[in-house]
Every structure is written in C-alpha cells, then in structure tokens.
C-alpha cells in the first residue's frame, strides 16, 4: 500500500451503514447508545409490570388480576429483575460507562472492542430468556431473591425458574465481561498526563463499580448454580431433608445482593458529582475524599450482607456486628452528600434539568438513607422486616436514587450524544411530574409498613386501603412521566436545536466538551495531553 492510499484510508472513518453497523458494532459510542436504548425499553416494560400490580393493590379484594396470585408473584419477580439487571445497570454502567469513560480519559475506544459487543448482546439474550420464563409453567413466582424452598422443585416444578437462572447467568456474564473491559481501559488507556487522581469522578465511580461486579457476580452465579443442581440433579445444598440449609442460599445471595445495591448506585454518584460541579461552576468539594468514600462504600458493602437476614435466627454477636457495620456505611455516604452540598455552597448555581434531577436525587437518597439507618437496627428490623417500610426504603435509595441520576446523566449528555439539545421547559416539566409521582407512590408506603402491612401480598385488610390507593395513583403518574420522557426524546431528535460543543459553559471542563456534538465516529486517535 503506497503513501497516498494510506492517507486516504486513514482519512475515512469507515462508519458501517444500516443494521450491520449496530449488530456487529465494536465502537464504544454505538454500543453505549444501544445500552441506553435497551435500558429505556426495559424500563418501560418493568414499569408497566409495576403498574399492573399497583392496580391490583389499589383496593382490597384482589380482583384486577382475577385472583391469579401466581401471576402477581411473577410480575413482582420480573419487575425487580428487569429494573435492576436490565434497566439501571445497562443505563448507568453499560450505557454512560461505555460511551463516556473513553471520552473522559482521552482514549480512542475501549480496550477490547469485540468483548464490548458480546457484553451487550448477552444482555439482550438474557432479557429474552427472562421474558420467556414468564410464559413457561406459570412463570417464576419466587421474587427476585429466588429463596428456596419456594424456588425448589417443591415450590416451582416447571422449567420457569431454570430459565430465570440461565437469564441471570447471562446477565452476570455480560456484566463481568463489561467490567473487565472498563477496568483495563481505565488503567491502561488514559491520556498522557492524566493520573488516577486527575480522572473525573464519574470514571472513578465506574472503576469501583467494575471491581464490585467482578467480586460479587460470581457468588450469585455459584448460588443459582447450586439451586439449579438442587432442582435438576438431586443435590441437597438447600434441602433440609437431605442435610442442606436454605439459609445458606440467603447468605450467598445477599453476599452478592448487598454489593449489587452499590453497583446500581455508584455510577449515579459519579454522574451527580459531574453535574453538580458543572452547574455550581466550582470544582467538586473534597475530590480525594469523594474517591475515598466510594472505595470505602465498595469495601464495607461486602461485609454487611446479613442485615437482610436479621429475622432468620442469627446469633446475638452476629446481630451486633451487622447492625454496627450497616450504620458505619452511613459515614462515607454522608461524606458524599455533604461534599455535594459544599460544592453548591457559594457556587454560581444554575438550575437546568440535569441539576434539578441531581438535587432531587440528594433529597430522595437522604430520605432513603435515614430509613436505612432505622432498618439497620436489628431490634427495630424484627418489626419492620418484610413490611412496606422496607419497600419504601430501598426504592428511595437504589430505585429512585439511581433513576434520578440516570435522568440527570441523560439530560446532561443527551446533546453531546445526539447533537440535538432538548427544550429546557420540557425537561423541567418531566422532572416535576416524576418527582411528584414517585414521592406519591413510595412515601405512603412508610406509613403502611409502620402499620404492619407485609410485602409481596396481593390482598390486604381494608385498614390499609387509603394509602394503597394514594400509592397506586402515584404509580400511574410516574408511568405517565416515563412515557412523557420517551416523547421528549423523539421530539428532541426531530425538532431540537443543534447542540454546540459545550452547551453548559465554563463549569463543564471535562474532555468530552472539547469534541463536536455528536462526537466523530473515532475520537482521540492522537491522545490529548493533560496539563495542570
């Protein structure tokens, strides 16, 4: 190949066209966009499932689902698994992580582009398997926790739970491969001059999350494989009549399950740090403290799992340890909350939609954190365990908290991804509808839990009817807000104004704002040099 043809070859971006561009893509931006589109689709499906069982719970009597309480449990299971594994993780970790980590560190792409492709398509396959399981033998009505004996052959004799287990295996594999890719990218492909402590906090949050996934996911894989062999190959890991112990499954599941909570929320912490710094026009307060807080949250998150199991008969010493350990997690989390507030303090603050969602996140996450401190007390948890108080707590933290950070990131970066800037008034309307809807849904559930209403039941005494109706109305408003969000996306893509390279002004000082909107197919082929 002579010099002229080489130059021509390098001058062309060789962007593939049509469906092959997406199916075979190894470009981190295309794969990030596919993750985000998939997450929005899965979120709508999971949200519709929750609306169905909120309609069932709107009034006592169990009439909406025609007394099909197995279907109710299948909806609960599918809603939880979809929202955790197919909505929040693909949006925050897969979507924004894939798209923006290489841009934020000045890398040309991810370290392993083909691995990136299979990570995404494994997730789609897992989603199809999970949806299919709902139509097999009555569906998996176990809850997302898959506790035996309900998930054993005695509780679910058909193939539904086996399909759900394979779905979880595939989504776990997808997450692990994506994590390896991101860790290698962050450690090996930073631009010259960008030390670890010059990286934006979003990159740090993805790095910590990736390590959590690699350490936690194999434990889930082991637990559900043992469950699979109990169901199909005559082992007795969790069958008491064969010398097994169902509580062992709970230990294994929650050793994964509690770090999973931080896997869900940590990338959101990173997004909020970027957004608040940008719109306060100040560097983040206590950068190294914020990094340290994330690392400590990740570490302590692994050693408090049994606070999900305070009522299974743990020893007195174990109760003391897990109560104290759980309360300690509030310290690094508090460091982050107060650092965000300190960043805003004295800043030149503006309030576009991403900033509203970030402030909404701080409010919601703080409410959820306070109820978490109450639940961390094993004595109080004896009363509150498996009531709607717990439902309210974890929705305020990992659900609403993570959702609001995802919306903050979406509005913050949508112009950069698409080249079209959303109309600010539409974004603000979306924020207020969502904020009112989710609070109307979940705040009354604190009262229901304190009054003694248990989780995972399709019918209830009339004493609980009032707040359940309020909660169901809130769910309807929240679903309307989600559909309105989809409308905003399509409206912006069709009628939105062209987005400048940096729509946010001086506060946005990370590398992605030096590129065009949308960025070219290949970026940073010559690495930028970071100074200062």
From Swiss-Prot:
Coiled-coil positions: none
Transmembrane segments: 33-53, 74-94, 95-115, 118-138, 163-183, 200-220, 252-272, 284-304, 318-338, 355-375, 394-414, 431-451, 473-493
Record's subcellular location: Cell membrane
Keywords, comma-separated and alphabetical: Cell membrane, Copper, Electron transport, Heme, Iron, Membrane, Metal-binding, Respiratory chain, Translocase, Transmembrane, Transmembrane helix, Transport
Enzyme class, broadest EC rank: translocase
Assigned GO CC terms: plasma membrane; respiratory chain complex IV
Binding sites annotated in the UniProt record for Cu cation: 258, 262, 307-308
The protein's name in its UniProt record: Probable cytochrome c oxidase subunit 1
Protein's organism: Rickettsia felis (strain ATCC VR-1525 / URRWXCal2)
